[in-house]
Amino acid sequence: KDGKVNPVILAAAATAGVTKIFKTGGAQAVAALAYGTQSIPAVDKIVGPGNIYVATAKRKVFGKVGIDMIAGPSEILVLADGSCNPAWVAADLLSQAEHDRLASPVLVTDSAALAKAVQAELEVQIPQLPRAAIARASVDDNGKIILCTDLHKAIEACNIIAPEHLEVCVEDPFGVLNEIKNAGSIFLGRNVPEALGDYFAGPNHTLPTSGTARFSSPLGVDDFVKKSSFIYYTRDALEAVAPRIADFAEREGLHAHARSVTIRYEK
């Protein structure tokens, strides 16, 4: 805001071995990195979260450059049973609600008593937040409490929603872990608030949102590695399979494909 880069960010970048830093942001930064300017070179890939304008800009430039995902708005789903502390659950829901009016805080539980207690706790805690207006809008517009008949039905609901952050706040989190199929990041147990994953635990917190955890993964080292396939056959090895290759190609009507193999063995 004052025209300077936060020194903590600069220190982290130096520790990570970053050699170039450009002081820019927003959709315009995405455009500059994708197409290049006089002062910013074009890049091959753009990663990381942002607001709705950044997400839309990344969608626009995809194809010109690679991207990791279209991320946001932020989501948290707390799967909780009746043994949970409702104040903790409410605090965890609000940790994402304060991000953005469009953020989605969701509680899925098999306990009606917990559902009521968490609802009451939200009303206590929201006014205490510096970003209370944002948290209030998020909870009112996008917040949900889903009451299920049992824990297994609750897990089914989680898998359908496929949340960005999933807190498994139940008595035996490892006992139900194998049932969980779709989530960006899974926080196991009552002592693992979402903020632990954001700031300290280690896994990247750029995560799939809007149900895309059904088919995509968090940002990770693979996003920064480009792979190629390698194929080598000897003459004898190719000759042994040449008729089968030609047969596949001819069945597709691609006779030049077949010819490129069989010509090597014509006398």
Regions found by a protein language model. Give the residues of each.
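Conserved NAD(P)+-binding/catalytic subdomain of aldehyde/semialdehyde dehydrogenases
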Residues: 15-104
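Structural motif
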Residues: 19-22, 43-47, 51-52, 68, ...
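Glycine-rich, charged/polar anion/phosphate-binding loops
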Residues: 60-65, 89-94, 132, 151-153, ...
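C-terminal core of ALDH-fold dehydrogenases
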Residues: 160-267
